[in-house]
């Protein structure tokens, strides 16, 4: 039991909820490789740091000798997961889904051991359900139970449309667990309802219900919303070391500690020590550098991490980037010149255009050459001349 308690303590690190912990302990006592499932719909071409929170936990199960299944939702991706959405997500074409799935397959191996990872596509069984099978599946849940889900409840109360296929989505994801006879399923906190549907469907199928483990959602570069490619507040795991370093350094000091909790492999005692050092006067930028280097070393190499730090020093610190630079947020895409004016970095749009022509404007350290550049959803550090800086989020 002591060994199980040790493993359990490691598995609980960074976890939001285990449903149920007693079930997990019973499964661990069986002393066999457990089937641990993580599903992802390839709705965008790249995996970002937000995805790695659950992937890191999957990797941990892998290290403890369990059977890891990474499920690519090539079927459910064409339906569209309504979790956390206040509008219907437009379904993707099969070509889009398969194209994105290829990059997922490549990028997960930056985190998971390819020799110990089983990749499956849920079209293998969902595509074979047919009309009769779909009717049997949907008979397991009522509309009333579906409306217990927060996002559906809010949309129904606000008279916002809910498409029938959105009700079906949790059942399809739950059926994945039946098809795989999963022991454990991982997901973000926004997936809790779907994971619990899987437990119910497994009971109906005569299987032991899976343990549902939810993990917190990583807040993106803007410091407000969950990391998402559509919001532009993300860092992709395939981005260059230089891009990664600059983006990590752009996050707020408060957000940095959340990222340490969810992304760092450092012992909790070491993270607590770093917090104490900051409270005692150490510059938070030093601690942010450590996080940036840890992530770059993980997804690239230690040599890349060192080189990215040096390039950052050459670009920014030698340009005396202020520690207390203003942070601003604007709604809707806008032209670069207007953004610089609204951010207080120039007096007028004509001055902004002139500074761009003279090579005096940089975004995340990269010189801008197009004065007519349109800035879409993103978070970046804008520099005008050698002394004017602002961290700007465009939503």
From Swiss-Prot:
GO terms for biological process, alphabetical: tyrosyl-tRNA aminoacylation
Record's GO cellular component terms: cytosol
Localization (cell): Cytoplasm
Motif ('KMSKS' region): 226-230
Superkingdom classification of source: Bacteria
Binding site for ATP: 229
UniProt keyword annotations, A-Z: Aminoacyl-tRNA synthetase, ATP-binding, Cytoplasm, Ligase, Nucleotide-binding, Protein biosynthesis, RNA-binding
Short motif ('HIGH' region): ranges: 42-51
Key word DNA-binding present: no
Pfam families: S4, tRNA-synt_1b
Principal place of residence: cytoplasm
EC number of this enzyme: 6.1.1.1
Sequence ranges assigned to domain S4 RNA-binding in this UniProt record: 334-394
Amino-acid biosynthesis in keyword set: no
First-tier enzyme category under EC: ligase
GO molecular function per UniProt: ATP binding; RNA binding; tyrosine-tRNA ligase activity
Oligomer and partners: Homodimer.
Database matches in HAMAP family: Tyr_tRNA_synth_type2
Protein role: Catalyzes the attachment of tyrosine to tRNA(Tyr) in a two-step reaction: tyrosine is first activated by ATP to form Tyr-AMP and then transferred to the acceptor end of tRNA(Tyr).
Recorded family membership: Belongs to the class-I aminoacyl-tRNA synthetase family. TyrS type 2 subfamily.
NCBIfam families: tyrS
Protein name: Tyrosine--tRNA ligase
Organism from which the protein derives: Pasteurella multocida (strain Pm70)
Lineage start: Bacteria, Pseudomonadati, Pseudomonadota, Gammaproteobacteria, Pasteurellales
């Amino acid at each position: 039991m002591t060994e199980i308690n040790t493993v359990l303590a490691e598995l609980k690190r960074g976890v939001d909820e285990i449903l149920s912990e007693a079930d997990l302990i019973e499964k661990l006592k069986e002393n066999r490789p457990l089937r641990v499932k993580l599903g992802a719909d390839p709705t965008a071409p790249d995996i970002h740091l937000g995805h790695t929170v659950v992937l890191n936990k999957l990797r941990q199960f892998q290290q403890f000798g369990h059977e890891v299944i990474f499920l690519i939702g090539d079927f459910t991706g064409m339906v569209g997961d309504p979790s956390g959405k206040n509008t219907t997500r437009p379904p993707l074409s099969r070509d889009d889904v398969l194209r994105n799935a290829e990059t997922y397959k490549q990028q997960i191996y930056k985190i998971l051991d390819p020799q110990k990872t089983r990749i499956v596509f849920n079209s293998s069984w969902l595509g074979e359900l047919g009309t009769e099978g779909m009717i049997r599946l949907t008979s397991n849940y009522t509309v009333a139970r579906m409306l217990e889900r927060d996002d559906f409840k809010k949309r129904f109360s606000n008279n916002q449309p809910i498409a029938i296929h959105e009700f079906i989505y949790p059942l399809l994801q739950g059926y994945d667990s039946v098809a795989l006879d999963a022991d454990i399923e991982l997901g973000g906190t926004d997936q809790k309802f779907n994971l619990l549907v899987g437990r119910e469907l497994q009971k109906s199928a005569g299987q032991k219900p899976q343990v549902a483990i939810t993990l917190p959602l990583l807040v993106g570069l803007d410091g407000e919303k969950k990391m998402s490619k559509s919001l532009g507040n993300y860092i992709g795991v395939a981005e260059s070391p230089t891009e990664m370093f600059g983006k990590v350094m752009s996050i707020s000091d408060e957000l940095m500690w959340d990222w340490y909790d969810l992304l760092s492999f450092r012992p909790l005692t070491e993270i607590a020590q770093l917090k104490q050092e900051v409270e005692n006067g150490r510059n938070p930028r030093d601690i942010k550098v450590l996080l940036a280097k840890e992530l770059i070393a993980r997804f690239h190499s230690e040599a890349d991490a060192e080189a990215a730090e040096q390039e950052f020093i050459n670009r920014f610190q030698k340009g005396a980037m202020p520690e207390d630079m203003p942070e601003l947020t604007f709604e809707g895409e806008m032209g670069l010149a207007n953004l610089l004016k609204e951010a207080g970095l120039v007096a007028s749009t004509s001055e902004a255009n002139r500074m761009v022509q003279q090579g005096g404007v940089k975004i995340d350290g990269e010189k801008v050459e197009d004065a007519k550049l349109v800035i879409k959803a993103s978070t970046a550090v804008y520099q005008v001349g050698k002394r004017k800086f602002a961290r700007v989020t465009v939503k």
